[in-house]
Amino acid sequence: MDNIDRLNYLYKQKKTLEFKINIVLTEMGLVKNKDGKYEELIKQYNKFNQELYDVEIEIVTRGGV
């Protein structure tokens, strides 16, 4: 998988996680955390964000793909 494919994959995963986080927040009514779902999603989201950032930096520092 090249960097562009990786970037596209990560962006897709990020959007999916944002959607799931919004569903969990809606289900919780922003009041309480059910079964630790929110924390787990936030961990995943942060992990993908970090990987996305790393790939973007790698692309920029290498001057392209």
What is the meaning of each model-derived region?
Residues 1-2, 33-36:
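Short coil/turn linker and secondary-structure boundary residues
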Residues 1-4, 60-65:
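Short acidic DE-rich linear segments
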Residues 8-11, 35-50:
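Short, charged, amphipathic alpha-helical segments
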Residues 17, 24, 31, 38, ...:
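Hydrophobic stripe of amphipathic alpha-helices that form coiled-coil interfaces
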